[in-house]
Amino acid sequence: MPNFLTHADWTFPIPIRYGPGRLLEIGEFCSQNNIANPLIVTDRGSRDLPFIERVGDVCLASKVQSVVFSDISPNPTDQEIARGKRAFVEGQHDGVIAIGGGSGMDAGKAISLVGCNDTDLWAFDYDHSESPDLASESFVPLICVPTTAGTGAETESTAMLTDTEQSVKRCVWHAKQKPLLAVLDPELTLGLPADLTAWTGCDALVHAIEAFSVPDWNPLCDGLALEAIRLISGSLDRAVTHGEIFQLLLA
């Protein structure tokens, strides 16, 4: 059984910094990536949670200024992204820290996508046959910090948003926009309601099953998927019903 209480760094497919308390290194991570004034993007429901204030305090201790943008609904809209871009530009920010569950990270990734270029948001629609011809320097440097289990969306650029004119959900992305790194701090998952732990854990389990079941066989991905299935199926029930045990282990 892996020891999940130790710190570990690896790259797959982007740099990942894992371990209890790694959030306390966020200011250092910003400095290492030449981010001096990040916009912290999260959703309204997370705005007043302790970890948001902690991110700002840790950044300040590393002489990194930051501002929180939290005008994000559970299903982020194109209008909210436009307001987020305006906050990014007016605040003269040089990076984005996307923190939260799906909505916070989707919004942060979308603001990173359009924050320092003039391309229309929907030009990045995943269903378009061609993406805008932009270099990686055309996108805002991005750090992702997930606060729940789930899809692994912190490692890639896709963001699901609501098109308010057509009242449909659309996916935006660009192949050259990827997070600089993801910070996986399991302490952020402690204290979640049991039902949310169950939902997001099942989400992660289903993604692992899907990854193993796809017809395009890949031995590396199959190995990762099978290990994820083994770990989640052996831990999820205990995490939901005895979450305090995990909290004691991480104390």
What does each model-identified segment do?
Residues 158-251:
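Carboxylate- and glycine-rich phosphate/diphosphate-binding segment that chelates Mg2+/Mn2+
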Residues 79-184:
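Glycine/threonine-rich beta-strand-loop-alpha-helix active-site module
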Residues 24, 47-48, 149-152, 189-191, ...:
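Short, acidic Gly/Pro/Ser/Thr-rich loop/turn segments
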Residues 27, 56, 67, 82-85, ...:
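Predominant activation on well-ordered alpha-helical scaffold segments within soluble catalytic domains
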Residues 1-95:
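ATP/NTP phosphate-donor binding region
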Residues 1, 74-81, 122-132, 230-251:
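A short, flexible low-complexity segment enriched in Lys/Arg and Gly/Pro that occurs
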